[in-house]
């Protein structure tokens, strides 16, 4: 009878054993990398040049994962995390590393990915777009968890790789006025009779005030509405409710939309503002978003009457400033609600050289009314990237392409397409949109050479 080899499962003895390892680098997700018995070992929380005591948690053929038990020899980049919830909340994962160290790591990781997967080693490395390391988030969504036994509602963030809600009293990366509202909101929500029917709470800091969006699964009674209204007045915040159908209703007043300015240091006549409904996507780091928009304008250098295509345009984060500078701009977005809001924003900013379309940018674009020769192209896709859209470069033939990316892996893949089509990487720069986390965003400029 034939006998087949069956790999033995990880023994409890193997996994419970404690090891002393030397960490030599970070992976792209911010975990320390060490070597043990010919395998790569990933250690969240460990830093390069550290000697650490770890416990293996997972063994695979070519790699292992381990839990950090103790830092025996700390790195010069190691710092004490500022947030008391750091080791339980799933939001941040690099607070134990200096801000300068984080940025150096992210920049090196970006260059490594681009060289390895795109073969893109040319071009000029632009200075990273950086800002405040703490209290930079102007928007956050807090989860709620109602305990049927204690009748208590917890308000916080979800733990890493878990649906468990970690109650928090503050958030060191959330705008300070919003962070200061967490405890008062938790107290308020526990006073509502409908607390078992409450969903997430979203907090927003905008240029025209502070906002809170409370998700509800059933209508609130008058007493609960009165409590919310009194809270809004006391804390000078706009509160709105979002029902099961996704509709929004203001509490104690008409619904007010948050507004952001997109460009800094502009005279009133040159200002560009963007309003949005609470359900729309916006960049959470306002300081970096302004710098990012300014850099995109500088790299694209839009001239009057140039035809510029903005794919994955959202509500006009880049389209509006491009049109303000005199270009004929076409914005295309896959989410219909955001296209509607983009048109509202164009009208509010008195921009008439701007047209928005709704469309699936992963589909056949050959018959789209906007498809054709353009002067310049801006791309700001989601994490999946813009691979399908770039297949139509021959029809568009832009002289310049600015690619704004929230995923270096898809940026590298798509950069390879651009390089194959005769474009050269001219500029590449890190965008540190999310300090204290491993997340890497970037901007790249390509120019047609043939």
UniProtKB/Swiss-Prot annotation:
Alphabetical list of NCBIfam families matching this protein: PRK13168.1, rumA
Protein name, per record: 23S rRNA (uracil(1939)-C(5))-methyltransferase RlmD
Keyword Metal-binding part of the UniProt annotation: yes
Upper taxonomic lineage: Bacteria, Pseudomonadati, Pseudomonadota, Gammaproteobacteria, Alteromonadales
Residues that, per the record, bind [4Fe-4S] cluster: 83, 89, 92, 171
GO BP field: rRNA base methylation
HAMAP family, alphabetized: 23SrRNA_methyltr_RlmD
Keywords assigned: 4Fe-4S, Iron, Iron-sulfur, Metal-binding, Methyltransferase, rRNA processing, S-adenosyl-L-methionine, Transferase
Organism the protein comes from: Shewanella baltica (strain OS223)
EC number: 2.1.1.190
Described purpose of this protein according to its UniProt entry: Catalyzes the formation of 5-methyl-uridine at position 1939 (m5U1939) in 23S rRNA.
Keyword Membrane: no
Residues at the catalytic site: 406
InterPro entries: 23S_rRNA_MeTrfase_RlmD (IPR001566), MeTrfase_TrmA_AS (IPR030390), MeTrfase_TrmA_CS (IPR030391), NA-bd_OB-fold (IPR012340), SAM-dependent_MTases_sf (IPR029063), TRAM_dom (IPR002792), U5_MeTrfase_fam (IPR010280)
CDD domains attached to this UniProt entry: AdoMet_MTases
GO function terms (MF aspect): 4 iron, 4 sulfur cluster binding; iron ion binding; RNA binding; rRNA (uridine-C5-)-methyltransferase activity
Family: Belongs to the class I-like SAM-binding methyltransferase superfamily. RNA M5U methyltransferase family. RlmD subfamily.
Cystine crosslinks: none
Segments forming domain TRAM: 12-70
Residues holding S-adenosyl-L-methionine: 283, 312, 317, 333, 360, 380
Catalytic activity: uridine(1939) in 23S rRNA + S-adenosyl-L-methionine = 5-methyluridine(1939) in 23S rRNA + S-adenosyl-L-homocysteine + H(+)
One Pfam short name: TRAM
């Amino acid at each position: 009878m034939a006998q087949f080899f069956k790999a033995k499962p990880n023994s409890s003895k193997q996994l419970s054993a404690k090891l002393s390892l030397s960490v030599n680098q970070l992976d792209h997700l911010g975990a320390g990398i060490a070597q043990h018995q010919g395998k790569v070992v990933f250690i969240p929380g460990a830093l390069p040049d550290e000697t650490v005591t770890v416990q293996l948690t997972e063994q695979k053929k070519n790699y292992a994962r381990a839990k950090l038990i103790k830092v025996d020899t700390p790195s010069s980049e190691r710092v004490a995390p500022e947030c008391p919830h750091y080791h339980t909340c799933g939001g941040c994962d690099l607070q134990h590393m200096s801000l300068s160290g984080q940025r150096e790591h992210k920049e090196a990781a970006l260059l490594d990915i681009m060289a390895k997967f795109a073969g893109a080693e040319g071009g000029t490395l632009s200075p990273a777009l950086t800002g405040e390391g703490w209290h930079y988030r102007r928007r956050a969504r807090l989860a709620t968890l109602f305990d049927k036994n204690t009748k208590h509602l917890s308000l916080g963030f979800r733990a890493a790789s878990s649906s468990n809600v970690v109650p928090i009293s503050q958030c060191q990366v959330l705008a300070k006025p919003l962070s200061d509202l967490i405890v008062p909101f938790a107290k308020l929500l526990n006073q509502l009779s409908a607390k078992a029917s409450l969903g997430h709470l979203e907090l927003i800091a905008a240029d025209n005030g502070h906002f809170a969006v409370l998700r509800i699964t059933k209508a609130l009674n008058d007493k609960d509405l009165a409590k919310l209204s009194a809270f809004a007045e006391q804390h000078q915040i706009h509160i709105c409710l979002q029902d099961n159908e996704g509709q929004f209703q203001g509490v104690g007043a008409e619904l007010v939309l948050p507004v952001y300015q997109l460009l800094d240091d502009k005279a009133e006549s040159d200002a560009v503002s963007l309003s949005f409904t609470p359900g729309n996507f916006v960049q959470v780091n306002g300081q970096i978003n302004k710098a990012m928009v300014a850099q995109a304008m500088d790299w694209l250098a839009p001239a009057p009457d140039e035809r510029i295509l903005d794919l994955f345009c959202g509500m006009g984060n880049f389209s509006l400033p491009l049109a303000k500078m005199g270009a004929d701009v076409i914005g295309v977005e896959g989410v219909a609600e955001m296209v509607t809001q983009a048109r509202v924003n164009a009208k509010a900013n008195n921009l008439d050289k701007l047209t928005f379309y709704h469309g699936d940018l992963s589909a056949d674009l050959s018959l789209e009314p906007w498809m054709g020769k353009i002067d310049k192209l801006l791309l700001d896709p989601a994490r999946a990237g813009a691979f399908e859209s770039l297949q139509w470069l021959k029809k568009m033939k832009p002289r310049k392409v600015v690619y704004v990316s929230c995923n270096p892996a898809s940026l590298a893949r798509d950069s390879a397409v651009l390089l194959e089509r005769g474009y050269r990487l001219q500029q590449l720069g890190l965008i540190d949109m999310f300090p204290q986390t491993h997340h890497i965003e970037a901007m790249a400029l390509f120019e047609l050479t043939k």
